[in-house]
């Protein structure tokens, strides 16, 4: 492969197996902002699904509109370019949702 081809070649996105979590805390603006930051810091995009609604990490309001409260079932689907980043994002969001509110 030529040097030019190596430079223009793009990596395939890594998509995780969706993770399922039962929320142990209510997701308000602070938590939604944290979820968006976690995904962006790891170079990933996440989609959260609750019931028939979904939200992505491009919109804080879409996450708020999921109305996640204690006991809400949430599916987290993350994709990114590096497996480690995808795993970190899933772990961080999962931890945030399963840590009870103070």
Give short role names for the model-derived ranges:
Residues 2-8:
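N-terminal leader/presequence segments that are low-structure
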Residues 9-11, 38:
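Short, conserved, surface-exposed binding loops centered on an aromatic residue
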Residues 13-23:
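Short glycine-/aliphatic-rich beta-strand segments at the starts of folded cytosolic domains
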Residues 17-19, 39, 53, 93-97:
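Generic detector of bulky aromatic hydrophobic side chains
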Residues 25-47, 53-72, 86-89:
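Amphipathic alpha-helical interaction surfaces in cytosolic regulatory modules
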Residues 72-102:
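C-terminal structural segments of small proteins and small subunits
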């Amino acid at each position: 492969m030529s040097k030019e081809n190596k430079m223009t070649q793009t990596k395939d996105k890594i998509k995780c197996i969706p993770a399922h979590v039962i929320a142990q805390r209510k997701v308000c603006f602070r938590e939604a902002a944290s979820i968006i930051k976690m995904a962006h810091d790891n170079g990933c995009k996440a989609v959260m699904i609750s019931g028939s609604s979904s939200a992505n990490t491009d919109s804080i309001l879409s996450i708020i509109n999921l109305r996640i409260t204690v006991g809400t079932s949430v599916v987290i689907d993350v994709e990114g370019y590096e497996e480690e980043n995808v795993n970190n994002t899933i772990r961080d969001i999962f931890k945030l949702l399963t840590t009870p509110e103070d």
